[in-house]
Amino acid sequence: MLQMIPARPSRALASLSEAYEECRQITARYAKTFYLGTLLMPEAKRQAIWAIYVWCRRTDELVDGPQAAQTNFATLDAWERRLERLFAGEPEDDCDVALVDTLARYPLDIQPFRDMIEGQRMDLLQNRYSTFEDLYTYCYRVAGTVGLMSQPVMGIESTNSRAPWDPTTPPDPTQEALALGIANQLTNILRDVGEDARRGRIYLPQEELAQFNYSEQDLFNGVIDDRWRAFMQFQLDRARDYFEQAERGIRQLSHDARWPVWASLMLYREILDVIEQNNYDVFRKRAYVPTWRKLCSLPVAMLRATVL
């Protein structure tokens, strides 16, 4: 469990190396697949990504962690004020020290951070989403923002400019970074359907459930039939479309960021394959990618990062 909003420190804060080490340990503990991808980055970039991840996780745990019952709008308002102090260079605990250093090293914009907090406010307000457009807004705020936060750290390859006579439109790195975050969150949602349902939450578009004639009660009962399989296949296909869009932007990244981003994308997308292999049973089976498959993906990711 991570500490959320402690009082201002009465002791000396950690050194910079200690702060980044704490962020590394938290990332390794809570995000094993993601952490594996960060190890492929240069040291400075992976440390910055760890610091960003820890802030995002702490933000998420405000409404989704062990102390979530104590969180209200005032809690999130206080967290946003603390964010403003971080951007002003005022850390309040050890993990903050790492993020403040990251903010000094890279041109991060505060708006994606604010938007993520707004996503947590959405979680306090609602536990259903009528349309995919509504769900997309939520996905942007809680996950698409991560891509926007990370992009300045990853860097854009300046040599990717095209010849003036090339009629094709180059990918927009910002949109591709956003697409990867959306794809990851849609994957999380599909993997965690059963877990969320047990908490009374449904992150699946109500309109689309109705189109497949699948009711909330069916979902709470964990019914797996042709309706559910067709519905889930539709959702999986859409998530894969976002991963495909994200692929087009990877070649725009700096060379030293392409391998880890390819690895992260491939490893996360494999969760969708596992859901299919589990016959779409996300109620009783946890879709996870075995370690051996993760390791097998790394050389493929390296090849794609080099060739594409």
From Swiss-Prot:
Bridged cysteine pairs (disulfide): none
Enzyme class: transferase
Essential cofactor(s): ATP; Mn(2+); Mg(2+)
Pathway stated in the Swiss-Prot or TrEMBL entry: Carotenoid biosynthesis; phytoene biosynthesis
Catalytic activity: 2 (2E,6E,10E)-geranylgeranyl diphosphate = 15-cis-phytoene + 2 diphosphate
Pfam assignment, any one: SQS_PSY
Coiled coil: none
Co-factor: note: ATP is required for the transferase activity but it does not seem to be hydrolyzed during the reaction.
Keywords: Carotenoid biosynthesis, Magnesium, Manganese, Metal-binding, Transferase
Protein name: 15-cis-phytoene synthase
Organism: Synechococcus elongatus (strain ATCC 33912 / PCC 7942 / FACHB-805)
Classification lineage: Bacteria, Bacillati, Cyanobacteriota, Cyanophyceae, Synechococcales
